[in-house]
């Protein structure tokens, strides 16, 4: 029977959050780095993330869960979890849930387990295989959500072979780490949500054969110090699976763009980009080494197919390009906001107000001459910092 070899348990009600800055433990090459980087205490600026996303093959159902360790839930007495679900008729269930205790363990068989536990017994737990080929989540939050989510890697090789081999390969920007540990995954969900829609009735959500991905992130730096605009998407487009987080830097980092992006073809990794190039970013083009991406916002016009957000950023989609330096290989994907999932302000209302929006994305493209079609699950964010 497997026994815990390392354990990190934080109780937000027991002074585990401190004012003194802390540095994360060292990055481990060729590891998913699932165990907490701030295992004993966490500072008011530090944060850690374990995220799991899934959507069905038709782009009609989505379910996402983001588990955090940070100081944002101190007043609510818990570490927060953001849970969102979307049904085919457009009904959305989304809540921020709070859990006093966050516990993560590494076991002797190499597996990793996590539990976010509230004082009244509600919980969200995850269990991840030692080779990152499978993950299972269990939701047991009375009056909110119950059920399971499963993710199973379907790449041609073990996910461990595609993990970052160096500290630099794992960084979104200096001191900020984002990785996609599982690569392409097949997913399934069976869940029941309480108080859904205007009638407040319970409703079940099923995904029998879907796609998705996992995200692991951490930093000692708060988000406003390195970004004011971000976009994330995980998608399956024909034989391609793609996953990208792109940020536009705040004044603290001279407004530079940053990205972590991965592109798989038939389960094989073909692009692992941590560099951004773009029309408005040509001043940084000389920094390009190896794989790179360009993400361009599509603004609404009479030919627009996508939906627009409710805030200052009114784009209707993106053009995402993967490229290899000194190579003819390249892939282009057209992304259109197909269905709204969530929409929340991040500033005071008004014509210059900022916010965050979640989308089911309609995506098409591939290599030159290809036009595969598929879907993705993503979100964009702007915050009111220069």
Curated annotation (Swiss-Prot):
Stretches for region Beta-sandwich motif: 1-223
Source organism, top-level taxon: Eukaryota
**Enzyme Commission (EC) number:** 5.5.1.-
Pathway of this protein? Answer: Secondary metabolite biosynthesis
| Record key words, sorted | Isomerase
Outline what the protein does. Diels-Alderase; part of the gene cluster that mediates the biosynthesis of the trans-fused decalin-containing tetramic acid phomasetin, the stereochemical opposite of the HIV-1 integrase inhibitor equisetin. The PKS module of phm1 together with the enoylreductase phm4 catalyze the formation of the polyketide unit which is then conjugated to L-serine by the condensation domain of the phm1 NRPS module. Activity of the Dieckmann cyclase domain (RED) of phm1 results in release of the Dieckmann product intermediate.
List the protein's name. Answer: Diels-Alderase phm7
> Which organism encodes this protein?
Pyrenochaetopsis sp
Recorded name of the encoding gene: phm7
């Amino acid at each position: 029977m497997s026994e815990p070899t390392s354990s990190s348990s934080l109780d937000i009600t027991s002074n585990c959050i401190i004012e003194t800055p802390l540095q994360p433990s060292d990055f481990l090459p060729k590891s998913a780095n699932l165990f907490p980087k701030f295992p004993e205490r966490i500072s008011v600026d530090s944060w850690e993330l374990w995220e799991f996303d899934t959507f069905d093959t038709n782009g009609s159902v989505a379910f996402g869960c983001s588990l955090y360790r940070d100081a944002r839930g101190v007043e609510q007495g818990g570490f927060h979890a953001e849970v969102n679900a979307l049904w085919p008729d457009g009904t959305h269930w989304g809540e921020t849930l709070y859990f006093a205790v966050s516990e993560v363990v590494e076991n002797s068989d190499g597996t990793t387990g996590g539990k976010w536990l509230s004082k009244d017994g509600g919980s969200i737990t995850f269990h991840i295989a030692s080779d990152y080929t499978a993950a299972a989540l269990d939701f047991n939050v009375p009056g909110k959500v119950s059920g399971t989510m499963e993710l199973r890697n379907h790449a041609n090789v073990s996910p461990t072979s595609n993990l970052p081999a160096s500290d630099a390969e794992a960084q979104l920007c200096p001191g900020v780490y984002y990785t996609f540990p599982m690569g392409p995954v097949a997913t399934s969900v069976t869940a029941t949500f309480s108080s859904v829609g205007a009638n407040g009735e319970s409703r079940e959500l099923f995904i029998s054969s879907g796609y998705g991905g996992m995200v692991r992130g951490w930093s000692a730096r708060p988000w406003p110090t390195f970004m004011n605009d971000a976009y994330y998407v995980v998608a399956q487009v024909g034989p391609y699976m793609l996953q990208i987080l792109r940020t536009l830097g705040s004044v603290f980092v001279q407004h530079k763009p940053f990205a972590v992006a991965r592109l798989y073809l038939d389960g094989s990794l073909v692009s692992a980009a941590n560099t951004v190039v773009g029309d408005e970013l040509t001043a940084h083009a000389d920094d390009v080494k190896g794989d790179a991406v360009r993400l361009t916002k599509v603004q609404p016009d009479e030919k627009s197919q996508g939906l627009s957000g409710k805030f200052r950023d009114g784009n209707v989609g993106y053009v995402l390009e993967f490229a290899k330096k000194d190579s003819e290989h390249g892939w282009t994907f057209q992304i259109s906001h197909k269905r709204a999932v969530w929409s929340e302000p991040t500033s005071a209302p008004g014509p210059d107000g900022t916010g965050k929006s979640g989308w089911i994305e309609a995506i098409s493209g591939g290599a030159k001459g290809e036009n595969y079609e598929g879907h993705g699950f993503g979100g964009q964010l702007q915050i009111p910092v220069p």
